[in-house]
Regions:
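Short amphipathic alpha-helical boundary/capping segments
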Residues: 2-6, 114-122
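Residues within the DNA-recognition helix of helix-turn-helix
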Residues: 22, 157-162
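Arg/Lys-rich amphipathic alpha helix in sigma70-family domain 2
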Residues: 32, 53-60, 70-90, 108, ...
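Structural recognition of an alpha-helix C-terminal capping motif at a helix-to-coil junction
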Residues: 42-49, 62-74, 156
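Internal acidic/polar
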Residues: 78, 86-108, 112, 139
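Short, Lys/Arg-enriched C-terminal cap helix and immediately downstream tail that follows
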Residues: 81, 122, 127, 162-175
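A short pre-motif secondary-structure segment
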Residues: 129-133
Length: 175
């Protein structure tokens, strides 16, 4: 019996193994959406707490990571409604850098600001697909499994999201 089925049956050790296996993926998703370590850690903890409570409702035919991402989308949305992020996307990029020079830092921060603003104008599902496809580097098939949408729908949403990003970034660059 696989870990998710055992965890759904109340096996705490199986759930702990699932936690260890998927912690980083859930944290990265939360960080990409919220942009601060503290908020991502808080949301990640809440996701696993809700997952533990919801395990009796888990449907084993669906990938466990899709179950977690569904919970994560709701927890992130709740968090964003409750408060605004305290640190900016630019701060996150600056902390992730390898200490570039001031000119490069300024250019990266400006690019990050523009990209963050453009992504923020996308619909929530477009944001998720951009995160999963390009930041998490997941295949279209994996994104379809995670979102519960057909691959053709994922490709269409991705195409519209990228067109919107190109338009937004192109129009900002022309100002």
């Amino acid at each position: 019996m696989d870990l998710a089925r055992r965890a759904a049956g109340g096996d705490r050790r199986a759930f702990a193994a699932l936690y260890d296996r998927h912690l980083d993926a859930v944290y990265r998703y939360a960080f990409y959406r919220l942009h601060t370590d503290a908020e991502a850690e808080d949301v990640t903890g809440e996701v696993f707490h809700r997952a533990l409570v919801a395990m009796p409702k888990y449907e084993p035919r669906r990938p466990f990571l899709a179950f977690l991402y569904g919970i994560a989308r709701h927890v992130v949305a709740d968090h964003l409604r409750e408060q605004r992020p305290s640190a900016s996307f630019e701060d996150a990029i600056a902390h992730a850098s390898d200490a570039p020079g001031p000119e490069e830092t300024a250019a990266r921060l400006d690019d990050a600001r523009r990209l963050r603003a453009a992504i923020a104008r996308l619909t929530p599902i477009q944001q998720d697909i951009v995160i999963f496809r390009f930041l998490e580097e997941r295949s279209t098939k994996e994104v379809a499994q995670l979102t519960g949408k057909p691959e053709s729908t994922i490709r269409g949403i991705q195409m519209r999201a990228l067109a919107a990003l190109r338009a937004a970034l192109g129009s900002e660059g022309e100002r």
